[in-house]
Amino acid sequence: MIKNLKKSKKEVYTHFQNAAQNRQSLFAILFDPEGFDVTSIEIQLKRIPKNTTHILVGGSTATQSQTQVAVRYIKEQCKLPVVLFPGDYRHITAQADALLFLSLLSGDNAEYLIHQQIKSVDILRDTDIEIIPTGYILIDGGIETAVQRVSNTRPLSQNNIDLIVNTALAGQYSGKKLIYLEAGSGAVNRVSVQIIEAVKKAITIPLIVGGGIRTQQQLQDAYRAGADMVVVGNAFEKGDF
């Protein structure tokens, strides 16, 4: 595992690149700011695994104020880089170290492909937050997720690996700096190792995988298949990590 380092602004993507080039595994804990509770978050921050390299903050239905409060508190209590994983442009706060500037590539909803990004410009142009263009691809995790409901899109079938690979490559060709394969919060089925292997073989940019990973074995399987970063949320909240 890569050594934990505090990353200042403009350094987060370099960290991703270096880790991918050196085959070092990144690990992120995802905090959903909805229903933010200081006591609960304080307890969770104290038990963050030693191999954690980043904190992601975001959710599909959180408010801007919830996100701001969560980011501010986590930054005060934790030295790891805090990266926004927004479900809406209103979740953006300049207090974070970086922003995954998500484009939902797996659906046909223009709101989450480009319109949300346009709406965010007035917020972002006056900040120095590191912006990382990210191709976000929903993979069927066996249940309907909050992202599906909010975006009104359907995930790609795990059986259609060619389509998933082509979608990831389309993201890379259009200038994305990361590809994020997402099975969804609480997914029954995680992104298969076959998908991870195929996408990693095809792209030349770092690969993030999240959703449905509940055990250390599943975590290591994702790394071996080619994930540069694995994101865990629900399993950490439940004490499995």
Language-model-detected regions and their locations in the chain:
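Surface-exposed amphipathic alpha-helices with a cationic face
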Residues: A20-Q21, Q68-C78, Q172, I196-T204
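N-terminal amphipathic alpha-helix/helix-capping segment at the start of soluble metabolic enzymes
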Residues: M1-F31, I41-E42, I123-P133, D140
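Catalytic cores of alpha/beta
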Residues: I43-Q44, L84, D88-L102, A198-V230
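Glycine-rich phosphate-binding active-site loops on the catalytic face of alpha/beta enzymes
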Residues: L56-A62, A98, L102-L113, A183-G186, ...
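Glycine/Thr-rich beta-alpha phosphate-binding loop at enzyme active sites
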Residues: R149-I196, E237-G239
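Hydrophobic faces of well-ordered beta-strands that scaffold small-molecule active sites
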Residues: L26-F31, T53-V57, V82-L84, L99-F101, ...
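Conserved anion-binding
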Residues: H91-Q172
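Active-site mouth loops of central-metabolism enzymes
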Residues: S25-I41, F85-D88, L138-I164, V209-R214
